[in-house]
């Protein structure tokens, strides 16, 4: 089982993201009050998740302390390997998510954080994209269950 460590949204695309203690996820729409709510290209992009362990490892590698929110993923988790969950479902309270694919880092993030080589360093360590199959609310500290 995993755990939600933080929830991260932005009201305006490409603006700074910020933490919230809880969020409402709506099937087929995304995270309420997030700039991408009802504004994603594909259903698999409704929500993003990233492992806190990958963030910590990256920070150790570059000897900096980049805040988890600066990676611009919606849900920061611990205790589960997200990359192993491609095409699987997870449950958080009444919410069911289907993990579709690994998010690869983008040059936008590298330029924004001003870290040369970031894209290469974060290949396969930059989170996953998921589809919301059932609506509900989640909070920091909630448990994540992997469905069979």
Outline where the language-model segments fall.
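Metal-cofactor-dependent catalytic cores
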Residues: 1-148
